[in-house]
Structure formats: C-alpha cells, structure tokens
Amino acid sequence: MESDVIADLRCKLKETEEERRKAAQYGLQLVESQNELQNQLDKCRNEMMTLTESYEQEKYTLQREVELKSRMLESLSSECETIKQQQKMHLEQLEETLSRSHGQEVNELKKKLETLKAELDEARLSEKQLKHKVDHQEKLLSSKSKEMQMSERVHESVSSETLTLQIELTEMENVKTTLQEEVNELQYRQEQLELLNANLMRQVDRLKGEKEEREKEAVSYYDALEKARVVNQDLQVQLDQALQQALDPNSKGNSLFAEVEDRRAAMERQLISMKVKYQSLKKQNAFNREQMQRMKVQIATLLQMKGSQAEFEQQERLLAMLEQKNGEIKHLLGEIRNLEKFKSLYESMESKPSANSVALEDDTYYTDLLQIKLDNLNKESESIKGELSIQRMKALLESQRALDIERKLFLNERHLQLSQSENMKLRAKLDELKLKYEPEEKIEVPVLKKRREVLPVDISTPNGVCAPSAVGEEDYRLSPQKEEAQSCSDGSEDNNLQLEKTVSVSTSGVILSPYKSLTLDIQPRKEKKCVKLTGVPADLEALSERSRNTPNSPRLAAESRLQREVKQGKETASKLEKAACKKSYPTVYVSSKSTPETQCPQQ
C-alpha cells in the first residue's frame, strides 16, 4: 500500500513538474513574443519619427519660403504705407497753411469791419448831436426874437421896476439856457464815451479770441516740434548704428553670418526633432492614461461585484444560523416531549400509591423519608429549571444583540464597499476631466540628493575587522527592508505582483597615505536599495493597500491590530538598537561614489 501511494505521489510529482516546465516554456515563448513585438513597435516608432522629422523639415523649408515671400510683401506694403503717410503729411501741411492764411485774412477783415462800424456809430452819434444842437439853437433864436418883440412892446408901456424885473428874468433865462447847453454837452459826451466803451469791449473780445487762436497755434507748433525732435532722435540713433556697423571690421565679411545661419538651421532642425519626439511621447502618455482609466473603471466594477458577493455570503451565513436554530428548536421540542412523558409517568405513579394508600398504611419510615427527599429534589429541579430558563432568555438576548451588531457591521461594510466603488468612479471621472481640460501637466524631475556617511576614525582597526563590522551593519540595515518586502509580497499575492529587490553593496577599501601612517582614508560602503513593483501601477498598488486595510470582519480587524502592534514593536526595537549603536565619534565625510572593482551585487 505504501509503495502504491509513493508511486502515485511520484507520478503526480512528475506531472506537476512537466506542467511547470510547460508553463515555463509557454512563459518564455510569451516573453520572447512580447520582446519581438516590442522591438517591432520600437522600429515602427523610429520609422514614424524619421518620416515625421523629414516631413517637418520639408514643412519648415516651405514655411521659410512662405515667410520670405510674406516679408517681401510686408516690405512692399510698408513702402506703400510710408508713401501714403508722406502724402497725407504733405496734404495736412498744405491744409494747415491754407487754414492759417484764411484765418489771418478773416481776422484782418473782421478788424476792418469793426473799425468801420465804430466810425459809422461815431458819425451817426455826431450827426444826431449836431441835429439836436441845431434844433435847440433854432428854438433859442425863435424865443429870443419873440422876447425882443415883447420887450419892445412892453418897454413902451411898462414902468421901470417891471423893466428891471424883466431884465433879471432874461438874465436868469440866459443862465438857464447856458446850463441847459452844458447839460446837453455832458450828455453828448456821455453818449460818446459809452460808444467808445462798447467799441473797446468789442476789441477786447476780439483780442481774446485772437489770443486763444494764437495759443492753439502755439500748442500745435510745440507738438509738431516735439514730434520732429523724436523723429530726429530716431534718425540720429539709426545713423549712429549705421556708422558703427560701417566701422565694425567683423561685419565686413560674410563668414560669421554664414556660421551663425548654419548654427541657427542646425538648432532649428534639432528643435523640430525634439518637437516630434515630444509629440510621440505625449501620445504614448495619453495612451497610458487611458489604460489607467480603464483599469480604474474595472477596479470599481470589481469592488461592486465584491459587495454583491459579500451579500451572498451574509445570506448563506444567515441561512446556516437559521438551520442551526431550527435544529435547536427541534431538539428542545423533543426534550419537551420526553419531559411530558416523564411527567405523565410520574403522575401515574403518584395515582397508584394514592389508590393503594389504605393497604400501605403500615409502610416504614424510609418511604416517608424518600418521599420528602423526592419533594425536595422536585423543588430544586423546578428552581434550576427557572434559572435555566432565565439563562436561556439571557442567551437569546445576547444572541439577538450579536445578530443586531452583525447586521449593523454588515451594513457598514456594504456602505464602505459602495463608497469605495463610488470613490473609484469619481476618481475615474476626475481623471477624465483632467484629461479633457488639463491635458498637459508639468513634470517635475526629482533631484537626487547625495548621501554622506559618518565613520569613526579614532579606533584604528585592520581591514579584516572593518569589513565584517561593515557587513554586519549593512545586514542590520537591510533587515527591515527585507521584512517590508516580505510583507508587501505576502499582502500582494492576490494581485500577482512580482517584487524585484536589488541591493548593491560596494565594499570599502582602506588606503594608507604615504606621508601619514596613522590616518586612514576609509571609503564606506554605499547601499543602493531599489524596490520595483512590476505589473501593477502605483494607483492600483495604493488601491490594493486600501482594500487590504479595510476590515471586512471583526476577525480581520483583530488580525490587522495584531500586525500593527507587532510592526510597532519591531520599529521601537530597531530604533533602540540604532540609538545604542550610535556613539559620539569625530566625523569624516567621504565621497559616496564607488568604483566598479569594489562593487558586489547581492540579491
């Protein structure tokens, strides 16, 4: 039997080995085919890039020709515009001169017209005054002639007193007439002064208008002078530049310009090739983004499927609990039936002694004692049954509470999964919007910082002692990294992640200087740790970590707590050991570059 079992196991082992070999061969074939496809893709991409570069070069040459023709057209159009501007300037100057001459003539004619108006007003006023004087003199003459006639008539018939009074009256009338003439003269003088004042006011208004016009002309002259100065300065600068170019000995030859033109053409070709490469890389990046978007959508759908699977598991668990409770109920019903049978038997047994009580009056004392004990036992059994029922009720309450808590936990887990799926969908939508509205992102190149290691120099140890200590320190430093890598590999088994961990440790060499035999120039080991996760992008890795960190049940929560406590204990222990290892030694800074002879790769 054992030999048959061993033979079967050996056959199974051979079959598994053959299957593994076949799987390895298929994997190698797939890898080779993938490499061939990648090489073909690279070749096609290079061909496309060369073709695009040639097309871009042709496009650039055509653009240059078009630019030259456009420049020629622009130069011709600029010449036409300059001629038009010159003609416009000439016309504007002619218009300005004609307007000025016309304004001057109009002003002269206005002056003459005003002078003629003033003379006409003066002549009219003098004529009016003279007419008024003539009328007044005629009235005086008529009144005097009448008075003379009256005086001659009265002189003959009137006495001397009346004559004196008449003489005085005539004198007073003469005085009155003289005063009246003076008043008229003053009125005439006032009218002349008013006319003169009006003429002067007109002249003042006219002079103000002329002053404003002269000020405007002065402002226009000043603006034209400033423009002429600016134009003169520009022309002077152009003249100075032309003189400097004429005096510059380097500008006389064409070799420098040809070299500059060649360099410019080479740089433009390089720029075109870089643009083509940039466009191809941009398209590749967009394709990778689309793939990432699809993966995120698939992860969201998987999360939704996981939520539905959790519902099915919960339903199965509830059905199992229901079956268990039904079995318990059946068992309790059977016990109740047995107890009813026992009770019926006990009642029948009690009825029989009651019927035969007359015959058994002379029973012994032991029967009474047993009866008392039986009664006590019945009472105790009843009390125990009551306590048992109370405990059963308590157990039912606790089970009900546990069921309620499990329901709440399940609802919370379902809400969590739904929120995770919605979060993934929102992230996918956000990435789509970013791709639409923010297609170009600024890529920040990470700056590599050089590390400087601190080595003790006071203790002079030989090479054989230094090397093991350094190796021990490096192993100690590598141990937490190995633990983290193991934890990552254990956690990412579901996603089929391949963890590649390369650690290159460069051995340190000790060189003694020829002049100082005591000082040691020690080159420390440089640790290069790089952990690469192939097959899954960073977003999927973060999502897998989140999905691992989300507790799906109390058992998983307890396990995660235990893992955290263990990790914290390990971290504290490593910190304490590092603090104990660190001592106050004088530091020396050594270059972190390692030679190819001293490198020792480890995996």
Curated annotation (Swiss-Prot):
The keyword Repeat does not apply. Residues 542-577 are annotated as: Disordered. Monoubiquitinated with'Lys-48' linkage. Deubiquitinated by USP45. One of its GO terms (molecular function) is kinetochore binding. Residues 561-577 have a biased composition (Basic and acidic residues). The modification Phosphoserine is found at residues 513, 553. One of its GO terms (biological process) is mitotic spindle assembly checkpoint signaling. Residues 1-442 form a coiled coil. It comes from the Eukaryota. Belongs to the Spindly family. Interacts with KNTC1 and ZW10. These interactions appear weak and may be transient or indirect. Interacts with dynein intermediate chain and dynactin (DCTN1). Interacts with the catalytically active form of USP45. This is Protein Spindly. The gene is SPDL1.
